[in-house]
Amino acid sequence: MNIIDELEWRGAINQQTDEEGLRKLVEEKKISLYCGVDPTGDSMHIGHLIPFMMMKRFQLAGHHPVILIGGATGTIGDPSGRQSERQLQTLEVVQHNVDALTAQMKKLFDFGGNSEVKMVNNYDWTHEINIIEFLRDYGKNFSINSMLAKDIVASRLDTGISFTEFTYQILQAMDFHHLYTKEDVQLQIGGSDQWGNITSGLDLIRKLEGHEAKVFGLTIPLLLKSDGTKFGKSAGGAVWLDPEKTTPFEFYQFWVNTDDRDVVKYLKYFTFLTKERIDELAVKVETEPHKREAQKVLAEEMTKFVHGEEALLQAVKITEALFSGDIKSLTADEIEQGFKEMPTFQSSKETKNIVEWLVDLGIEPSRRQAREDINNGAISMNGEKVTDVGTDVTVENSFDGRFIIIRKGKKNYSLVKLG
């Protein structure tokens, strides 16, 4: 199947401006296409992956993706999908975020070979345009009536929208025009909330370059979970691509915990597995859901794609250790990843009796309860049961002098940091 057929099978297309024309174009030649992201933060989250996975699919099909980092538009703020004004950021913060997002993109895309990916920053061609040029060369081509009718603006008319954010769609249209004339970009991809911005770009190109210009727009559906909530959030908030914000273990766990009703959809959206392999996994979901094979494959594919093979192996190792309760083989760094969200306590490195120590930390409510739990075999330290109420806790019991893990019962873990 060609790239458009594949995207349709994966359920990845929401709207497109000219399906027949785009299908014909990609069959005739390898095209350049672009997708942009504004540096509103110093990391992308998994919601950002959706359009960029599509870009990656085009790359694998031999087409030429152009990734735009919005160093200019990021200083303005996209009103799409928002009920209020964005807080303007300083140029220094924006540049820091540009650098961080650029580094993340370089991990996701192959920047060499026959289907080379280009990275551009719209600040490079926008910052020298003065206000007179902006109004004469670009503003003249936009009707206030049509701009007000765009959903991104119309939804904000009651609550208010600044002139700054109102003109955002012009800046994005200028980007498409620039990339069309300088990089031969003929297709823009974006989320479902970008339809108005994308069509503004198409209109501008045709006004400036002629109606025969072959340019297209394509948006991706808003991805909702089976319970109707928006995809991309965990109990702890957004799931980030930055391993300092969301560890590879947490990232892996997010995908492993996917609902049976969603996992096949996610395999289509996010992985590069073949239709045959996904169909096999879909059968497993129906016939052997308890094995969660589809979820494990999804988690493996995504963790490897974003964080690499080594981080995947580490995430699997931590998962297996937590499941079995055998955590002795873990390193201190793996302990830090795996127990990040567990109840955490602080202790000195001073040697103490286990009963006194558990009560002082607040893990046990009383000495009597601590002794009872130890005598009943309910307390484990670093994966080994504590059987003697006279046991001393020393720094030698810790992982690399940093952590001690206490398990009370079968599942109640606590992380004790020494310092």
UniProtKB/Swiss-Prot annotation:
Q: Where does ATP bind?
A: 233
> Where's the motif 'HIGH' region?
39-48
List each coiled-coil range: none
Keyword rRNA-binding attached: no
Q: By its UniProt entry, which Pfam families does this protein fall under?
A: SYY_C-terminal, tRNA-synt_1b
Q: Which domain of life is it from?
A: Bacteria
Q: Which SUPFAM superfamilies match?
A: Alpha-L RNA-binding motif, Nucleotidylyl transferase
EC numbers: 6.1.1.1
Give a GO cellular-component term.
cytosol
Q: Which GO terms describe its molecular function?
A: ATP binding; RNA binding; tyrosine-tRNA ligase activity
According to the UniProt entry, where does the motif 'KMSKS' region sit in this chain? 230-234
Q: What is its main location?
A: cytoplasm
| Cell compartment(s), UniProt | Cytoplasm
- Class of enzymatic activity (EC top level): ligase
Q: Which reaction does it catalyse?
A: tRNA(Tyr) + L-tyrosine + ATP = L-tyrosyl-tRNA(Tyr) + AMP + diphosphate + H(+)
- Entry keyword set: Aminoacyl-tRNA synthetase, ATP-binding, Cytoplasm, Ligase, Nucleotide-binding, Protein biosynthesis, RNA-binding
Q: How does it assemble?
A: Homodimer.
Write out the similarity annotation. Belongs to the class-I aminoacyl-tRNA synthetase family. TyrS type 1 subfamily.
Q: What role does it play?
A: Catalyzes the attachment of tyrosine to tRNA(Tyr) in a two-step reaction: tyrosine is first activated by ATP to form Tyr-AMP and then transferred to the acceptor end of tRNA(Tyr).
Q: What is this protein called?
A: Tyrosine--tRNA ligase 2
